[in-house]
Curated annotation (Swiss-Prot):
Organism of provenance: Lactococcus lactis subsp. lactis (strain IL1403)
GO term, biological process aspect, one: L-valine biosynthetic process
The protein's Enzyme Commission number: 1.1.1.86
Function in brief: Involved in the biosynthesis of branched-chain amino acids (BCAA). Catalyzes an alkyl-migration followed by a ketol-acid reduction of (S)-2-acetolactate (S2AL) to yield (R)-2,3-dihydroxy-isovalerate. In the isomerase reaction, S2AL is rearranged via a Mg-dependent methyl migration to produce 3-hydroxy-3-methyl-2-ketobutyrate (HMKB). In the reductase reaction, this 2-ketoacid undergoes a metal-dependent reduction by NADPH to yield (R)-2,3-dihydroxy-isovalerate.
Cofactor: how bound: Binds 2 magnesium ions per subunit.
Family: Belongs to the ketol-acid reductoisomerase family.
Protein name (record): Ketol-acid reductoisomerase (NADP(+))
Amino acid sequence: MAVTMYYEDDVEVSALAGKQIAVIGYGSQGHAHAQNLRDSGHNVIIGVRHGKSFDKAKEDGFETFEVGEAVAKADVIMVLAPDELQQSIYEEDIKPNLKAGSALGFAHGFNIHFGYIKVPEDVDVFMVAPKAPGHLVRRTYTEGFGTPALFVSHQNASGHAREIAMDWAKGIGCARVGIIETTFKEETEEDLFGEQAVLCGGLTALVEAGFETLTEAGYAGELAYFEVLHEMKLIVDLMYEGGFTKMRQSISNTAEFGDYVTGPRIITDAVKKNMKLVLADIQSGKFAQDFVDDFKAGRPKLTAYREAAKNLEIEKIGAELRKAMPFTQSGDDDAFKIYQ
């Protein structure tokens, strides 16, 4: 299905002009949205609970308030707290202070789509979801371009929710390179599937299985690390720049031949069948409920998963090897640590 890409010239109405904007949260996405909007000439305040993020927002020159106070002052509110915290923040701080006729935005559809947050009918609901982490949203903006984004007009009480979403995307720099209109359902389900089946869950499981196959056959762990993890970036960068075509043009004929004949032996019809089961769990809300239940119970499952992952042999070997490869550290992780 073809989609339309919109750009700055397509944003005909300055829907944010003269509006008081409140960004809720000052983490990875929060600092980027707030700073980019301010640099685009908009009036931005920060709503965040007292702590490091509160202090950092003030240090960066923003008027900073507790969440409820910021919401009460604002015409347009963007919720950029972590998914698992949004429901309680909404119920305790946002909902009691939300004015009729205001607009409430999100950068991911999790809580709206799965029904954990229900917004009054007299409030606009929109989404702008940059397809990049916050430090890249900020950095690319300062460099004069931006990152692509998805946008949604979900609840159009004022008749201007779509214009607000598009103007927000323009204000943070995303409309410079292109924005695509979608729905909360599509963004949420596709995003979760991509993370789980390919980008995070699928990829780490594939790398770990490859590492174990080599080491169990007697090959050195250090060499296995280079073959299945370290060189991953080289291949992904080529695909990022020019798709499968550029990657295959850049590798040896031996590697390309092996790609064609062996890839389907690894990613079989059975794997695709499992992917469909993963998608079904996402669509039904099962994954969302499992995630929320674990959070409310104090994260026992997530904590156990993290501990097990930390003790993987590939992680221990990789940590030692990277000490001798400072070039693997881009510096972007420092920005992430600051704005968590």
